[in-house]
Structure formats: C-alpha cells, structure tokens
C-alpha cells in the first residue's frame, strides 16, 4: 500500500513524500525488537489503536483524488488527522475486468475531533 504523510494531506500535493508500506503477518512481532526506538531505526511503525476515518474506493494510490475526498470528509466532520494516512490495496491488477481497470483500495487515517 501507500503511506501518505500527514503534513501533506491538506496541501496542493497530498501525495508529496508518499512511500510504500507492508503489513506484517501476526507473529512477526516476535522477530522484531521490542524497543520503539529500535523499531523506528529500522523503519517499522506499529499503527496504534484508535479512531480511523476509512474510505473504500476504486483508484490508484498515486492519484490524489482519493486522499482529497478523505480530506474533504475530515474537514466537513471537524476531524483532525493525528498520523499518516494509509492506502491499503485490497484488489490489484489480478482482479481487473471489463468494468474495473483500477485497484480497489481503502484509505485509513487516524483522527480526533478538532
């Protein structure tokens, strides 16, 4: 999936600085350091429990329309992002057919009320 930086979400280029991420399977934490500083050093981030604004959509992670719709929804409902947004790809090119030539994704952003 794609990780979209919180600092860029309300900008003219909400995908600026975006990068990729991977979801590790249950049990992988046993192979990783337990110290948060060590995890950060190797680029591992654990998504916290909390309230997330989620929006499923057809589209590509490098197209800004999806995150712009999420940002508009956050603004409309007085929500503030408290972390990076994550665009999870559920169905990719392996699921393309005549009606859909795009990925099916879910953008998730940790939020709080303003």
Question: Where do the PLM segments sit?
Answer:
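A solvent-exposed interaction/effector surface
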Residues: 1-114
């Amino acid at each position: 999936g794609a990780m979209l930086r919180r600092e860029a979400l309300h900008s003219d280029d909400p995908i600026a600085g975006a990068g990729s991420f991977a979801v590790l399977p249950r049990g992988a934490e046993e192979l990783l350091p337990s110290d948060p500083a060590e995890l950060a050093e190797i680029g591992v981030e654990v998504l916290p429990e909390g309230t997330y604004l989620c929006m499923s959509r057809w589209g590509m992670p490098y197209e800004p329309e999806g995150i712009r719709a999420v940002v508009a929804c956050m603004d409309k409902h007085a929500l503030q992002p408290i972390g990076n947004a994550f665009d999870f790809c559920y169905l990719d090119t392996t699921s393309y057919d005549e009606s859909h030539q795009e990925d099916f994704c879910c953008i998730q952003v940790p939020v709080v009320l303003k």
